[in-house]
Amino acid sequence: MAEYTAGTSPLVDLINSLPDSDGTWGPPITNETTLNGVPYAPFSKSDKLGRMADWTDAKDGRDGRGRQQYNRNYRDQQVYGAGSASLFAPPAAEDEASFSVVSNVRDTGKTRFGRGAIFTRGRGQRGRGGQDTRGGGRQQFQRGGRGGQQYGGGGYSDRGGGRGGGARGRRFGWKDYDKPQRNRDASVNIRPDWKLLEEIDYNRLSKLNLDTDEGEDVDSYGFLYYYDRSYDKPPVKSAERKLAVVDRAVYNVTTSSDPIIQELAEKDEATIFATDSILSMLMCAPRSMYPWDIIIVRQGNKVFLDKRDNAALDMVTVNENAADAPLEASEGSKDVINQPGALAEEATYINHNFVNQVVLESSNQKVDMANENPFHSASEETEPPASKAYKYRRFDLSTSEETPTYLVVRTELDAVQKNPTSGEDQFVTVHALNEFDSKAQGSGGALDWRTKLVSQRGAVVATEMKNNSCKLARWTVQSILAKADVMKLGFVSRVTPKANDKHVILGCVGWKPKDFANQMNLQLSNGWGIVRTIADMCLQREEGKYVLVKDPNKNILRLYEVPANGLDDDDEGPEPEGVAEEED
């Protein structure tokens, strides 16, 4: 065996070459890994901190709720200091370890909305045009029996379902795939021979702008009763005022059937003619969600904005703009009174009677306009006319002095009241908001009016502005067009949430129309720009008939050119199932 000496042994040389460790074991401590003598591990503030260990989970790390739950619990679970290598290594182009995609797409519910049929077909309208030029569309609202009003699916049909996600978004739950989605039907049947001319989305409409003057009065007709100021006071619980049925003759005559507009057109007073109901729908189009249609007739150099009988825009919608709008009740459900069609008919009925109830009918105290009601015939009517004044007003929509363009619109006023300061007469428009059930689906998070209307009136009105943006905007535009001094909004609720045939009046609040428009961020210049744009589209084409249709499921307006007989009775849509007709 070979013998090694101390001076020549390789092992001894290796040991002697090691640094002095001062009695410690292991590699020496360098300054690079100490901070004031305290060892530390390099780390970055951007490192994500997670659980070091979770002894409560199953060994496979999954809780049985699927991949989505697994990703949410274990995404980016990094241990302390795991990112220290990034201090010395060059940064990667894309760090996919901490990158995740979260979908922010809202689950948009699609509602199936159908025709705009008015109540029942008993004592109907007095025929538009043709035989009686002064006739036209007086609407009779009829009541049902013990079961309340006989509502069909005529107003707005909504067969959709599902637990609509609203603004919060949601995950699909058990059998969500098996629940019907909301798809609305168009308000008018689109025929194959209709020619699509224009397609305008809401973004383009919102950018239009046209400044106009406040308009001038051309002529006035009808009369007005004085408003009953006692409805402005909060009712006492023991003496609540119930909504009464007031039978008065009310007329809803379209533009081309109005004898006064026909006379003004013959005198060449304007280029565009419309009624306040049709014009307000067009001016507030970017706020609308439900389908509607407007008939546009060009004769020579004139444009008439018309509507069909019992059109969708005649109905008073309920919570149209709510995040979770009312749904069509499922088959066999008992909640049929809270479906969109029933709510629209109920709201229309309430508005018809409310405006007639809040006036003081007295032949000695009323304000007569320059002319009598052009639609009422005392020899033919059995009911007295309602308090209504029709003011025909003209607006200048010219964009240059070379080609003047004027619009004549028939506006309506509902009552008159004395100014408490000056004692002068103020013109009033009256409308009613209705509460059906604050806890039901489709209520839009509305407060209980009976307990909150007096103490939190601002919150109640703000909620209604959100849920009924289109309806309130239309009422405000109509008040401004008529140059009304005050716009009265009544608050009407059901006596019991489960019955829609009895209502109680909770109060009435008045606003100046322009102030209310500012609160709603309503710009009339945008509305006038929409009207002028649509009119120019028709004036640039040949004479004929056109139909402007709101897409039932998209924020788009479509302009169609239709043949002369392209809007027959067949285009009114199929008769809703289950509509009960009543005879007087």
Curated annotation (Swiss-Prot):
What is the recorded name of this protein? Eukaryotic translation initiation factor 3 subunit D
Lineage, highest ranks first: Eukaryota, Fungi, Dikarya, Ascomycota, Pezizomycotina
* Comp. bias (Basic and acidic residues): 173-184
Q: Which organism is it from?
A: Chaetomium globosum (strain ATCC 6205 / CBS 148.51 / DSM 1962 / NBRC 6347 / NRRL 1970) (Soil fungus)
Q: Where is this region: Disordered?
A: 118-184, 563-584
What the record says about family reads: Belongs to the eIF-3 subunit D family.
Where does it mainly reside? cytoplasm
- Region (RNA gate): which ranges? 312-326
Composition bias type Acidic residues, residue spans: 567-584
Q: How does it assemble?
A: Component of the eukaryotic translation initiation factor 3 (eIF-3) complex.
The record's keywords, sorted A to Z, are:
Cytoplasm, Initiation factor, Protein biosynthesis, RNA-binding
Q: What is known of its domains?
A: The RNA gate region regulates mRNA cap recognition to prevent promiscuous mRNA-binding before assembly of eif3d into the full eukaryotic translation initiation factor 3 (eIF-3) complex.
